[in-house]
Amino acid sequence: VLWAQGAATIDWLSDENLTTVNWRTTEASSASKEASAAIAQGDTEAFEALLPQRQPYAAARDEAAFKLVRGVILEGQIDATHPLGYGFTDEVLPMFRRSANFMARSENAYSTPVLYSATPLLSGYMSAENQALASGSASLIVDARGKGAVVLALDAVTFRAFWWGTQKLLLNALFFGDLLEEPR
């Protein structure tokens, strides 16, 4: 079992073709990618149409801060029948979150043992756009590869050893790693 934690690690694994992940993106990020594609094709009209509206410089810092996700608690829904869910008795699992990256659910219906609820924010501040991205997104994905598996985890399940509720996920990956296969 390979436990991959954090967006940068997951991106690297994806770039090296060791796993596959689909990211949910903000409207601004999608527009930026479309604008880059338009300029690469020489379509300046499409490029101009995709550029964001001009904003006052003084507002930049505040706007950027509102888009951050720093220390929120989100409502995860765990599949207690999954090997990573062993020992959990409640379907609701509060997850500590420090990142504004969100993964789409796995293409395999059995490989997303923890996903966020429809209204995930339990505590802290999160922009409406990030709440919409988090809604129904994956917190953990198991990607079976050959005789092993890669566990993709965006959240720090053992964050500073004070977030006790989710530490079992990591321990279950260690103890039940041989059971982490993708049912087809």
List where the protein language model places each region.
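A glycine-rich, often tryptophan-bearing local segment used as a flexible ligand/cofactor-contacting loop or short
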Residues: 1-84
